[in-house]
Amino acid sequence: THNYFEVLDRLADEGRAIISYDQLGCGNSYVEGHSELWCSETWMNELIELRKYLGLDELHLLGQSWGGMLSIEYLCDHKPEGIKSVILSSTHPSARLWAQEQHRMIKFMSQEDQDAIAKAEATGNFDDPAYLAANERFMLLHAAGVPKDTDPECLRRPKKVGTDSYITAWGPNEYTPIGNLSNYEYRGKLKNIKEPALIINGANDLCTPLVAKTMYDSIPNSRWELFDDCRHVCFVEDTDRYCRLLNEWMEQND
């Protein structure tokens, strides 16, 4: 959902319009009982139509995680006009590469957790308590933790999570992509992205340095910024640096 992006509202202090939205299937756009909608085509059409509706002839496009995947697809397959730059934040160009990197990081966990995850993937039973505990520990290491009372209100605010859309499109977790995005593969097309691209990831991110470097090496006009000690939400864990970086980047590419 858009909630956690509200930590970036300060970017509007520079006189920019900041637009974020809940994609169909989560948050304020949550709907039930339409599993046929949970695919890339739906969310791509949503982005295209939203841009038309708001008259966004020129913009800087920021895609975080799945949003970055959608941005890559948008630039490579639709070749839109008016994109001043793209910010690819903690995202990836390949479901296969992403899964490989998650499994590599799983090997640093306890043998008990490794076994629980391997068993779940082998049996298809993702409800076992041992697996659920292992997955929670994995996500705590590389994604994010439970918001604290001292965190900004937007992080603590109740939200409608798009679990159904996530499972249908991606899978039961970050390292088992068995949904309809399992064949997502854009490594060979990254060279066709002509827009300036800022690639951001955290040192402890689900988006590992290898994933980020793969994008950096392949996109001609790109810059890579690695955030030390950050997980999958660099913009939350180091908001000040993230905002400074984005302001600098957008000014350079206006």
Region spans (language model):
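Catalytic active-site module of serine/aspartate enzymes centered on a nucleophile-bearing elbow/loop
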Residues: 222-254
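Conserved loop-alpha-helix segment in the C-terminal half of the alpha/beta-hydrolase fold
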Residues: 187-230
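Alpha/beta-hydrolase
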Residues: 108, 112-195
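Conserved HGGG/HGGXW glycine-rich cap/lid loop of the alpha/beta-hydrolase fold
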Residues: 1-32, 36
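Conserved hydrolase catalytic core segment
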Residues: 57-101
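Conserved acidic catalytic loop of the alpha/beta-hydrolase fold
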Residues: 41-59
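Flexible "cap/lid" loop of the alpha/beta hydrolase fold
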Residues: 84-126
